[in-house]
Amino acid sequence: MTLQATPLNAIHRALGARMVDFGGWDMPVNYGSQIEEHNAVRTDAGMFDVSHMCVVDLAGANTRSFLRGLLANNVDKLQTPGKALYSCMLDEKGGVIDDLIVYFFAEDRFRLVVNASTALGDIEWIRARNAATGSDVTITPRREDVAPAGVQPLAIVAVQGPNARTKVWSTFPSTQPSDTLKPFNAAVVQDPALGEIMVARTGYTGEDGFELVVPAENVAAIWEKLNAAGVRPAGLGARDTLRLEAGMNLYGQDMDINTSPLDAGLAWTVDLQSERDFTGKAALAAAGSRQQFLGLILRDKGGVLRAHQKVITPAGDGEITSGTFSPSLSQSIAFARLPKDVAVGDTVQVEIRDRKLNATVVKLPFVRNGKALVS
């Protein structure tokens, strides 16, 4: 099978990146040292090519009401242009089709950013719901492989770290209006050479920074200028350790179509209290939450916490969904679905090969804005 490639593929290869198959995409896992890339984001600034993710623009007079029924979180929270909201999109059984970010620009104009591996299915689902509800929303995917003819494809570069925003501003003065952006807000600016840039104060690392949504034809120039300004290229390996430390779920790993958001630490993104109906609401209300979603820190030596390892507790067994060695903490950490009677601070055991190693249950996240929140 031929892998799909982002517009930055040739640049990754020229930089000596180790490339891997990531859900059918040819993507950089690192450029030499995953730990150095991780630490650059925690202490300075790093950048990620996330152009495999898909922007989907929604337009029309009924867009808000359509999204009120499509998403588990409530888009009525979005009243200021540029404001963003994290949400799950559920099926009728309450399973997670995808997790995404929705941006509000005007009553007739919203933007979604969805995951790479789910993008085609997401678009199909959104179109089907649009038809079923008679919402008459115009749905326009913007990734190169799915953008309609005549529509400008978009690419995405995430610039993350304590110095990320100042390096973006100094490299692209046109983005300076974004200096007043609060977290989870976006601004659209015009660059004389690079065209329209959406600057979003969002990310997937637990650090401050921007995600830049740019014309695909100009993303190489943007990447090279940021690289020249000292923003370090970082691959999927560092992205995974950073998001794990930050307590951020990965679709397909920590939740999927067979998982309720209530069992994946995402109850805060689900609006069950208001009268608003949405796809999956009845199923979630009927089933409730069956498990907790918490963090683990390995206390014994002799292993690394990994997905699918069994967690043994006095209240019954649980399972790790994501695990890694944390460069920031120098400890092995994990997310786990655990029985409801397990408490933060409890000691549990994790089956690693033929051994049972002790781990401590902790509240997520592990690290935020460069500071350890656990010990």
From Swiss-Prot:
Family assignment from sequence similarity: Belongs to the GcvT family.
Coiled coil: none
Keyword annotations of the record: Aminotransferase, Transferase
Catalytic activity from the UniProt record: N(6)-[(R)-S(8)-aminomethyldihydrolipoyl]-L-lysyl-[protein] + (6S)-5,6,7,8-tetrahydrofolate = N(6)-[(R)-dihydrolipoyl]-L-lysyl-[protein] + (6R)-5,10-methylene-5,6,7,8-tetrahydrofolate + NH4(+)
GO BP terms: glycine decarboxylation via glycine cleavage system
Name the record gives this protein: Aminomethyltransferase
Transferase among keywords: yes
Zinc-finger among keywords: no
One cellular component term from this protein's GO annotations in UniProt: glycine cleavage complex
